[in-house]
A protein has these predicted regions:
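Conserved micro-motifs of the catalytic ATP-binding
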Residues: 22-27, 65-68
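Short conserved segment of the HATPase_c
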Residues: 118-130
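A conserved beta-strand-to-alpha-helix junction within the catalytic ATP-binding
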Residues: 28-43, 100
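Short helix-loop "hinge" at the ATP-lid/N-box region of the Bergerat-fold HATPase_c
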Residues: 84-85
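Short alpha-helical segment of the dimerization/phosphotransfer core of two-component systems
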Residues: 2-7
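Conserved glycine-rich
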Residues: 159-160
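Conserved catalytic submotifs in the C-terminal HATPase_c
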Residues: 28-31, 50, 55-64
Length: 182
């Protein structure tokens, strides 16, 4: 049963990666509230957070309108939060925030954890397809290295960007920036 679930997840991640590589054209039909997508992604992971003993908090204001495929945005945020949960210590907390950039041109989602952090040697490759960092553990054993690649390609398809700051033992901050909708 575990193998079937893992295979299903791999196939799902591969399909998401393929879809995330298709450019998104801004239109009135694909305007969505980023805060709603972020809140939905966090709600989707409530059980996983509870099982890991990690508290996830969302902050920001609504609406923050962007042009984009709502499902792709939600999945990208979900992958960021899922990683933060998995790499956090039991009893830890993950902070998720939605805000506008200082110039007001971008919507910014930040996912902050105080977990293991990413080893410096892994940082240049962390968004590559199938790349798995050197800090794997029993909670990360089922991953195949597509989660952050999905985030990167979803960001690029939406004319945005994703960055990471991390220090071993201090945690990580992943920042997804997307152009705001007019």
């Amino acid at each position: 049963r575990h193998s079937c679930v893992r295979l299903d997840r791999m196939i799902s991640d591969l399909l998401m990666l393929i879809k995330a590589q298709e450019p998104v054209t801004a239109s009135e039909a694909n305007r969505c509230d980023l805060f709603s997508q972020v809140s939905g992604a966090v709600d989707d992971l409530a059980g996983a957070a509870r099982d890991a003993g990690v508290q996830v908090r969302v902050g920001g204001k609504s609406p923050v309108m962007i042009h984009g495929e709502a499902d792709q945005i939600r999945m990208a945020v979900r992958k960021m939060v899922e990683n933060a949960i998995v790499y956090s210590h039991p009893g830890g907390a993950v902070g998720v925030s939605v805000a506008l950039s200082p110039d007001g041109k971008n919507a910014v989602v930040r996912v902050i954890d105080h977990g293991e952090g990413v080893p410096k040697a892994d940082l240049p490759r962390i968004f590559e397809r199938f790349y798995r960092g050197s800090n794997q553990n029993e909670r990360t054993a089922d991953g195949i290295g597509l989660g952050l690649a999905i985030v990167k390609h979803a960001a690029l398809a939406h004319h945005g960007d994703v960055t990471v700051w991390s220090a071993p033992g201090q945690g990580s901050t992943f920042t997804l920036s997307l152009p705001v909708g007019d």
